[in-house]
């Protein structure tokens, strides 16, 4: 650029001596400004830069942090990396230990190791994610999922996720990648296996319901037996009481009449009942004889 400006100045027609000096100063200032602009660059927040020079290649010992930096124009130029963690979703069909097809998806939060950027650039370039992540994720998923049955992938999902995270983190270190988080976002099976699992669950629910009905019937049967035994015992005791003292039935009538009269007394309606309606007839000779015998028996 500076050489072009000098050539342009040489082709200009000669003028007054002062004008030529001013033009040379102007061209010199332009060349200096261009050189300064090309010598300065900025590394933004969350980024790192490395130098590539045209003689020695990538400088292994230079990793530039955020801020303003200088370089030698044409001889050096910066290569800037974004070192912030970025999410990526990767899906992979694989097979379980019992030969069931499993569709599994992972969310991987990854970033480059800032201390190894020069070697990463030499091996992988700037598109390191596309070159590395899909292949190592598929490799680890197939290795881990093959250790579990399809049912275990559901019941032991936390353990499966932990094992995938551990192996994938170690595998990524070989490519200067740091994984901040690995999580299973989707886990699905083939239609045939899903239908078989649903049918099994329905059968288990029906078996549990049948077992519940059987247990309920047994409980009801036991309850009826206990109730029948209680009624038989009560009838037996009542028969013994009547055989020993016929006045017992009269006493039951009195208690029944008391309950009836108490109910009528608390009612807002006025009701008139005869002694017969009260299950109590004081003029009944059998009642009098039974009551007297009851009183004598108590004495």
From Swiss-Prot:
The modification N-acetylalanine is found at residue 2. The modification N6-acetyllysine is found at residues 147, 200, 236, 250, 262. One of its GO terms (molecular function) is sphingolipid binding. Pfam families: Band_7. Phosphorylated. Tyrosine phosphorylation is indirectly stimulated by IGFBP6. The modification Phosphoserine is found at residue 151. Residues 190-238 form a coiled coil. GO terms for biological process: antiviral innate immune response; B cell activation; cell migration; estrogen receptor signaling pathway; mammary gland alveolus development; mammary gland branching involved in thelarche; mammary gland epithelial cell proliferation; mitochondrion organization. It is found in: Mitochondrion inner membrane; Cytoplasm; Nucleus; Cell membrane. Its main location: mitochondrion. Induction: Expression increases approximately 3-fold upon entry into G1 phase compared to other phases of the cell cycle. Also induced following inhibition of mitochondrial protein synthesis by thiamphenicol. Residues 19-49, 150-174 are annotated as: Necessary for transcriptional repression. Residues 121-124 are annotated as: LC3-interaction region. Keywords: Acetylation, Cell membrane, Coiled coil, Cytoplasm, Host-virus interaction, Membrane, Mitochondrion, Mitochondrion inner membrane, Nucleus, Phosphoprotein, Receptor, Repressor, Transcription, Transcription regulation. GO terms for cellular component: cell periphery; cell surface; cytoplasm; mitochondrial inner membrane; mitochondrial outer membrane; mitochondrial prohibitin complex; mitochondrion; nuclear matrix. SUPFAM superfamilies: Band 7/SPFH domain (SSF117892). The modification Phosphotyrosine is found at residue 128. Expressed in myoblasts. LC3-interaction region (LIR) is required for interaction with MAP1LC3B/LC3-II and for Parkin-mediated mitophagy. Protein with pleiotropic attributes mediated in a cell-compartment- and tissue-specific manner, which include the plasma membrane-associated cell signaling functions, mitochondrial chaperone, and transcriptional co-regulator of transcription factors and sex steroid hormones in the nucleus. The mitochondrial prohibitin complex consists of two subunits (PHB1 and PHB2), assembled into a membrane-associated ring-shaped supercomplex of approximately 1 mDa. Interacts with ESR1, HDAC1 and HDAC5. Interacts with ZNF703. Interacts with STOML2. Interacts with ARFGEF3. Interacts with SPHK2. Interacts with COX4I1; the interaction associates PHB2 with COX. Interacts with MAP1LC3B (membrane-bound form LC3-II); the interaction is direct and upon mitochondrial depolarization and proteasome-dependent outer membrane rupture. Interacts with IGFBP6 (via C-terminal domain). Interacts with CLPB. Belongs to the prohibitin family. This is Prohibitin-2. It comes from Homo sapiens (Human). The lineage of its organism: Eukaryota, Metazoa, Chordata, Craniata, Vertebrata.
């Amino acid at each position: 650029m500076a050489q072009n400006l000098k050539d342009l100045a040489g082709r200009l027609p000669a003028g007054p001596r002062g004008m030529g000096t001013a033009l040379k100063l102007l061209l010199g200032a332009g060349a200096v400004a261009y050189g300064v602009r090309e010598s300065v660059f900025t590394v933004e927040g969350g980024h790192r830069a490395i130098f590539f020079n045209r003689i020695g290649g990538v400088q292994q010992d230079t990793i530039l942090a955020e801020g303003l930096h200088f370089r030698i124009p044409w001889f050096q130029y910066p290569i800037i990396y974004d070192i912030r963690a970025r999410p990526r979703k990767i899906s992979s069909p694989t097979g379980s230990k019992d030969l069931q097809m499993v569709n599994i998806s992972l969310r991987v939060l990854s970033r480059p190791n800032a201390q190894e950027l020069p070697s990463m650039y030499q091996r992988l370039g700037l598109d390191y994610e596309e070159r590395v992540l899909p292949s190592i994720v598929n490799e680890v998923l197939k290795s881990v999922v093959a250790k579990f049955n399809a049912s275990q992938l559901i019941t032991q999902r936390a353990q499966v996720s932990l094992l995938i995270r551990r192996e994938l983190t170690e595998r990524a270190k070989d490519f200067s990648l740091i994984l901040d988080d690995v999580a299973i976002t989707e886990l699905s099976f083939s239609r045939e296996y899903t239908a078989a699992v649903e049918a099994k669950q329905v059968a288990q629910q029906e078996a549990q319901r049948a077992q519940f009905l059987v247990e309920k019937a047994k409980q009801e049967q036991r309850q009826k037996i206990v109730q029948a035994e209680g009624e038989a015992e009560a009838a037996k005791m009542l028969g013994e009481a009547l055989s020993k003292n016929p006045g017992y039935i009269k006493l039951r009538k009195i208690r029944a009449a008391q309950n009836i009269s108490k109910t009528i007394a608390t009612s807002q309606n006025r009701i008139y009942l005869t002694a017969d309606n009260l299950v109590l007839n004081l003029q009944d000779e059998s009642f009098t004889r039974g009551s007297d015998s009851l009183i004598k028996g108590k004495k």
